[in-house]
Amino acid sequence: MRFSGRFKGYNLQKFQKDLIAGIVVGVVAIPLGMAFAIASGVEPEYGLYTVVIAGICISLFGGSKYQIGGPTGAFVPILFGIIMQYGLENLLIAGFMAGVMLVLFGLFKLGKIMKFVPKPVIVGFTAGIAVLIFTEQIANFLGLRNVEKHENFHHNMFEIVQQLGTFNVYAILTAVIGLVILLVSAKVMPKVPGALLALLISTVVAVVFFPDRMATIGSTYGEIPRHLPEFQFPELTLDKMVMLFPAALVIALLGGLESILSAMVADNMKGSKHDSNKELVGQGIANMAAPLFGGIPATGAIARTATNIKNGAVSPVSGVVHGVVVLLVLLVFAPYASHVPLASMAPILMVVAWNMSERKEVANMLRLKNADSFILAATFALTVLFDLIIGVATGLLLAFVFFIRRMSEATRIHNQETHPVLAKREDPSVSMYAIEGPLFFGSIDSLESSLLEHVQKKPKTLILLMNKVHYMDTSAEAVLGNIMNRIKRHNGKLMIVGLQSQPKELLHKTGLFHKIGKQHFFDHHDEITG
């Protein structure tokens, strides 16, 4: 049994490895799929639909052989906010639009650009999402009643505090049993899917010893149907697309970033190399397909991808198997899921939040007490207090500002008044400066002030040593042109030594090279004669 193309060299032995890995990760995905759906504000079956449809598509069309896709914790606060504001139908439309965007991102080769998001921003918003997921489950863990959900963190926390008196002892016992099983199984039986084990045991305990004493999936959302929903293309109108564009863009950007991070984790574990652009296309196809069958937005799941690799996966077939396993469980066991207490789901999500919180990274970066610490803290705080969009946008803006500041400080301008060339000329109207570092909009202020000051003192000839300037933008080019004009008004001249390829190309394109004059450019200062 051999296949060509992507599965070249594939055989029965490899399929057996993929089958085992796919079954294990499929079992892991079942409780997580339901839990993430509930946390996002939709019925649990939508999470399972997503695992099946999006999970299979991501494996078949993505750029990583080991990627496992589906609903993830990172999406929870985003999807919950969209549900609160626009409703489920519009969430599905936003997910479809995000899929189209992701395909376009991949086709326009934007995969590598997504890797440029600074680490403090990633750690900050990931930790912020973890806090939101964890705190959102406090009500289910304690079995609180009549807790209304709000878009803002502080409103939700105030609501929980107000309803603390409605706690349910049976729900707390059920949640604690699930939490203990999760923690113990991770230490004692690391290869056993702890989430499924905790879900099953805590549910059985609740059904046998505390029947009808707490909220369940059935009492809250109704019975899960034993089939996929019918194919239904979303009703797209221009007004809806304009309204949902910001939400779709956030889903696309977060989904793309999360999927590439997950693929990079897989690369580190297997020594492989994923195709970022193909991964974005695969994620896009998955997010276009999932809403057609009731699925919510999906992305690469780091923990499930790692589980896939640890259990011997060798190809995308394992991801397909994982989707098929979830589908079979959905078709056979769906009615039994109505008995699962919400208190059994809460510790699963709390542990997911704890594991994704980047605690060590946060502590290490905050200890640095530098720009990265400030960016992380700002991104984290704004993600929690407002939303992911504000948090990430502010984090990126701060990172940009600090980067410009660092780069501008890296530019140095040195007066070369003792240079041998000046000593030979013995002309007091000639000055020479050596410039080091990039010349761009962030460094032009010091460039202009330094050079113009000396142009006024020695207006005849200015020699610039630029062999250590490897980048120049149009802002710096404009300053250079201004300096040249000042010198020419005094019948002087500007000479440039050691101009590198990128600045030279820029000066040619803008015409400044011709205005300065070819005869005033030198490869080495020894060539200066006039």
UniProtKB/Swiss-Prot annotation:
- Localized where? Cell membrane
Gene Ontology, cellular component aspect: plasma membrane
A Pfam cross-reference name: Sulfate_transp
Keywords linked to the UniProt accession? Cell membrane, Membrane, Transmembrane, Transmembrane helix, Transport
GO biological process terms on file: transmembrane transport
Q: Does the keyword Signal apply?
A: no
Start and end of every STAS domain?
A: 420-530
- Signal peptide residues on this chain, from the entry's feature table: none
Regions that span the bilayer = 19-39, 41-61, 68-88, 91-111, 121-141, 164-184, 192-212, 241-261, 313-333, 384-404
Q: How does it sit in the membrane?
A: Multi-pass membrane protein
PANTHER family from the entry?
A: SULFATE TRANSPORTER (PTHR11814)
What does the sequence similarity comment in the record state about its family?
Belongs to the SLC26A/SulP transporter (TC 2.A.53) family.
User: What name goes with this protein?
Assistant: Putative sulfate transporter YvdB
Q: Which species does this protein come from?
A: Bacillus subtilis (strain 168)
Gene name as annotated: yvdB
